[in-house]
Design a protein with these regions (language model features):
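ABC-family nucleotide-binding domains
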Residues: 138, 145
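Conserved structural motif at the start of ABC-family nucleotide-binding domains
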Residues: 2, 17-19
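The feature captures the beta-strand-to-loop junction immediately N-terminal to the Walker
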Residues: 33-35
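Conserved ABC ATPase "signature" region
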Residues: 92-106
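Conserved ABC ATPase signature
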Residues: 110-114, 118
Length: 185
């Protein structure tokens, strides 16, 4: 379980998060919802240790390895889809995961040859390949059609059986996957 107690974070004197309290279970899908500019991405950055809170404490995340997909897919442009996933796994695992996310036959494509939804799936495959102690997905269903959303949703559900999956989404299907959630406002 990860506990955020009285978390506050400001940028340039403007509070983005103010006295936020959240308990994230050790498994299952946890949702972070809210309008744009409400601190969802900041909360993710705090959870993974990319930033420190101005106040409060985060309990239970010390030493955790987070596997993260941010809003921007952050694929390496000089590497193929297979190369991007193989950075964190062996080639056989990378091929299997690309197959699982519906990209069989696209392994040798470079990021600039992929659609937005395909890039998103490469990023998700890479995050799954990395493993980590928890999976954090910022808008995992962006650019995906309904059938692919359900397919990716099943993969997320399987992963969440043993580890926490934290998703930030505006997508109604994505929201339906969560067992617990918080709305930032």
């Amino acid at each position: 379980m990860i506990i955020l107690k009285n978390i506050s974070k400001s940028y340039g004197g403007k509070a983005v998060l103010d006295n936020v309290n959240i308990e994230i279970p050790g498994s299952g899908v946890f949702g972070i919802f809210g309008a744009s500019g409400q601190g969802k991405t900041t909360l993710i950055r705090l959870l993974c240790g990319l930033e420190k809170p101005d106040g409060g404490e985060i309990i239970g995340s010390d030493g955790m390895n987070f596997s993260v997909v941010f809003q921007e897919d952050r694929l390496f442009p000089s590497l193929t889809a297979l190369g991007n996933v193989s950075l964190v796994s062996d080639e056989a695992t990378a091929r299997r995961l690309l197959d699982l996310v519906g990209l069989h036959g696209s392994e040798d494509k470079y990021p600039d040859e992929l659609s937005g939804g395909m890039s998103r799936r490469v990023a998700i495959a890479r995050a799954l390949a990395y493993g980590g102690d928890a999976l954090i997905l910022d808008e995992p269903f962006k650019g995906l059609e309904s059938e692919l959303k359900e397919h990716i949703g099943k993969l997320i559900g399987e992963y969440a059986q043993t580890k926490p999956v934290i998703i930030v989404t505006h997508d109604e299907y994505g929201k339906s996957l969560t067992k617990n959630s918080v709305i930032l406002s």
